[in-house]
């Protein structure tokens, strides 16, 4: 069995405003930096053999904070980026509904094929995640791998590992700075811990 530690990046100014940042390279907020440090403390006793992160700063800095004092380098990959919202980047859902009513309608229907103007679709993001999943296959039994990325990216990865149709990705909840733990076996994967944020209690 290999063990996967899935971490969603910490808070950003954009997340506080409930805006869609996608590929926009926003920084962690002061709260997000504190969350990353609390994650480091939470995982301090874990043996971690490899660390992967999205190459967007909010994920990279979260991963680097967790990795502080370890010998492993953080491997940053564009395949782990959040979905590209294109023209919708920086907008909130109310603004999207006013400016792009048809896009908002299709989003509510969870259309996998919906491509954001100037951006990408969930199907295309799912393809990126598949490429990363193949990279994970090189890690052997007994290894623990930390993956720091974004909400949709991690949820699609979970679906793929669990053998679930990717259209169910939105039915998992992953909060900011949350920890999810999975075990992978030749016959499939097991979800051991989902969306755990106990490390944030009293530390926000």
Identify the role of each PLM range.
Residues 1-2, 75, 85-98, 138-144, ...:
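Acidic, low-complexity terminal tails and accessory targeting/binding regions
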Residues 5-66, 115-130:
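Loop-to-helix element that buttresses phosphate recognition and phosphoryl-transfer chemistry
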Residues 13, 58-60, 82-84, 145, ...:
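Short, active-site-adjacent cap segments at secondary-structure transitions
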Residues 36, 100, 111, 129-133, ...:
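Short amphipathic alpha-helical/adjacent loop interface patches that line ligand
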Residues 37-105:
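Phosphate-coordination/substrate-recognition cap region in phosphate-metabolizing enzymes
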